[in-house]
Amino acid sequence: MRTICITGSAGGIGAATRDRLEKEGARVIGVDVRDAEVIADLATPTGRDAMVAAVTDLCRDGLDGLVAAAGIMGDQPLVVAINYFGAIATLDGLRPLLARGTDASAVAISSNSTTTTPGLPIDLVDVILAGDEAEALAATSRAPGVFAYPAAKLALARWVRRHAPQPAWIGAGIRLNAIAPGVIETPMTKNDLEFIFSIPDVFPVPIGRPGRPDEIASLLAYLLSPDAGFFCGSVVFADGGTDAAVRTDDYPTPRA
């Protein structure tokens, strides 16, 4: 039986992924602020440390898979605290358990907003990636508009790309990848769906509907499985065609 940890397991994509994996026979350790095996607030260093300690206590023999799905929208500094710093603390903190697992795989949840948000300030992304959380939260508070979410998700995707090929990850037998969902119908996004689908010239969704959490869960289950054994450092888009529609010719970009 595989043992897999999912943060954000109480709702949305995390809950759908839990359901999918448990139906496949996996033992799932859920992490959330409610209705989970491990109750933890990933917005704070103390909460992250408590999460790592609790998961370690429950998984003495190691982890075979990890999904860093905890995330929020709304308050800008809190978005960065949870969606970036909470995610990398999860990935780094549980990496020793993954190293003891079998055919281990970790997947972070990024977003297609990383490539489809006009005017996203890359300097904010760089500040987040630099790793000083206090400075990153301060910079986020000063940033215009609602750039915290895409900036945090872009920083997370780049963190995954930087770390996946390194000895600490693939060198230890751990595959690290990310996915970039588009508009998914979850409790977190329900208030935004009508607006998003009212501006097709700005934010097209060629498939014509929001995605379902179970569709993303299927992708995550695949990336966690041995069938995805050649994936390392990939950021897989599942967004109904939005990224392709707005970036038709600027991906892939040839190496300089």
Annotated model-derived regions:
Residues 71-76, 99-171, 183-184:
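Catalytic loop of short-chain dehydrogenase/reductase
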Residues 33-50, 55-56:
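Rossmann-fold cofactor-recognition segment
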Residues 89, 148-150, 154-157, 178, ...:
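C-terminal helical subdomain
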Residues 7-10, 14-19:
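N-terminal Rossmann NAD(P)H-binding glycine-rich loop of SDR-like oxidoreductase domains
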Residues 6-7, 68-69, 105-111, 175-180, ...:
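Structural signature of the Rossmann-like NAD(P)-dependent dehydrogenase/reductase core
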Residues 180-191:
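Short, flexible catalytic-loop segment of classical short-chain dehydrogenase/reductase
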Residues 232-256:
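Short C-terminal tail/terminal secondary-structure segment
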